Amino acid sequence: MNYRHAYHAGNFADCFKHALLADLVDAFARKPTPYFVLDTHAGVGRYDLEGDAARRTGEADAGIRRLLASQPAPLKRYLDLVRSLGLYPGSPTLIRALMRPIGPDLVGEGHGCCHDVMPGAGPASTPCDAEPDKGVDGGPSAAMTTGTGRRARPPKSASMLMRQADRLACCELHPEDVIPLRRLFHHDPQVEVHFRSGWDALKALLPPREKRGLVFIDPPFESQDEFATLADGLKRGHGRFGHGVFAAWYPIKQRAAVRGFHATLKMTGIRDVIAIELYLRAPTNAERLNGCGLLVINPPYRFAEQGQMIADAVLQGLGQDESGAGVDVIRIADE
């Protein structure tokens, strides 16, 4: 768990996946019924692009700052959100901004809550007026309990609110990153924060009670077998939530590893799978991040066309002109 996204926030890969993510979430608002979003690798939620970590790499200068300056028309929705949210939004902040708010007739005072789950523990809630509790080592403590030793339940009105509204569940396993994530959503009745593995959440949190939703998987790709782990996670998640939309980000260094991942997923028998890929350059140097892709299972209507337009706009806005730069839309499995 050495990966820290603060060093890479706002880079070209972030812009690509977040612009596509915004379009996916918007698609769910076309119907009035509530939807659920699971963000399996949420991070801290928002990032200071003027901070030491971001400045050390300068990746945002060649990413989001270029797009904000060039303003490609197909990215207006995404870029307007980035501007309006203050600190640069990570995926959970972006998703939350796109979710439909609870109507004023449903909201009661003091009923915001944020669920915290420790690895191996069942769901529990933290009182809304409490600061995020810490263990003796400064890390997140176990979920709070009542004086009788039983796990505290959220207020009834909060539970009712979450049943009637769009809902987001964020998972983060890094003990330092989960604390600011909990603070960010501590009073939000539509958001749950889980201190647990996102891979485990694919079993524990699916299927959702809302019956429709999006699973966003954005792993750090720290290990050599991450593509295999991702393929297995998608297979297990789809097995529990077959009609859900799954979106998984992956890096492109060399083409062979990516095509092997696609072939593995095709062998699972999962239907209706596409991938949208963006290349900054030809993927010939395995030491560089040459591009990235977003694989989508059960994509919304016309998402392939919309996704290609968004990816083309990202590439154009970044001003990339290296040999091999481009966008590709791949049909991995038919409907």
Indicate where each model-derived feature is located.
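Acyl-thioester-dependent acyl-group transfer interface
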Residues: 141
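Compositionally biased, low-complexity flexible segments
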Residues: 122-124
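Class I S-adenosyl-L-methionine-dependent methyltransferase catalytic core
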Residues: 1-117, 134, 144-335
